[in-house]
Amino acid sequence: MSGYVGRLAPSPTGALHLGNARTFMIAWLRARSCGGKVVFRMEDLDHPRDKPGAAAAAVEDLRWLGFDWDEEYVQSERRAVYRNALARLDAYPCICSRKDVTSAQSAPHAGEQLFYPGTCRGRFASWDEAAAACAPRIPCWRLRVPDGTTVRFDDAFAGPYEQDVSRTLGDFPLARDPDGAGYTLAVTVDDLLMGVTEVVRGDDLLPATPPQILVARQLGHAPPAYCHVPLVVGPDGRRLAKRHGDTRLAAFRAAGVSPEDIVGWLAYTCGWNAKKTPTRLQSLVGRCPLETIPHEAVVWNGSFT
């Protein structure tokens, strides 16, 4: 087995759909095609949005399509890991609401990230003090970002990417949790400790990458490589949602669609099949180059044929 370690990281906030399946397929094939390892991680820290039964359903859907993995983790069982990592970071509690942050800067243009000016830097001695000051709201942890902090990396699919984090984001949020059990901190720590060598995910998460790289560096580690691939969208160009019909993998299975039909269509959208031919996932191992994947979003028109 090579030293490559990839990961599949679904969240139980909803059912897996075609877009998830395409990204996971690329991630899985990147690992298996070089004899690498696949880590499965359930990212279940967003408890208010978690759907009952969604975690088990995600495992069932992926197994049905032909996925397998070598290690399995659940983030909600790893709070002590995140707490220990948080203690090593230059982080502080912040009580500013989104409205506070927005009003502290000139009006951002659509799509721009919010810049945080450091209002709560040095303001509170502890999380508990901050929590008392903003009750019943919950504070968040922010990472202190020194002036002149720019992150540059080469994405395996999207190419060179650069962001001056100190000027565009400022001290960015890590987690809204006393133990640091939130997305930015948790995924970064887990990727490091699980030995993930490349993160393959949707290109909507490309802007989330520079903060994660900074967290990794503050923890004294080199970050993994990254590969951000286009999403599957509806005919209106917007990411898949109920307005585009039922694109849940479970719904296709219930309707009698075979896993080979789905994998074949996904392979066709990646340029790995010349036609929308039913295909087993395992048969794509070793014939899944990134170079044939279009750089535009994939449009789902409602049919696998």
Question: Model-derived features: where do they sit?
Answer:
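Charged/polar, solvent-exposed surface patches and flexible loops
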Residues: 60, 84, 88, 103, ...
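Non-catalytic terminal extensions that flank enzyme cores
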Residues: 1-15, 38, 65, 128-138, ...
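Short alpha-helix boundary/capping motifs
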Residues: 89, 111-114, 244, 280
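Short, surface-exposed, polar/charged, turn-prone segments marking secondary-structure boundaries
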Residues: 34-36, 66-70, 169-172, 215-216, ...
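N-terminal Rossmann-like or analogous alpha/beta NTP/dinucleotide-binding catalytic cores
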Residues: 1-112, 203-204, 208-221
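Active-site cores that bind ATP or allylic diphosphates and position pyrophosphate for catalysis
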Residues: 100-241, 248-253, 301-304
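Alpha-helix initiation and N-capping motif
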Residues: 55, 79, 98-101, 113, ...
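Proline- and acidic/polar-enriched loop/turn elements at helix boundaries
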Residues: 43, 74, 96-98, 228, ...
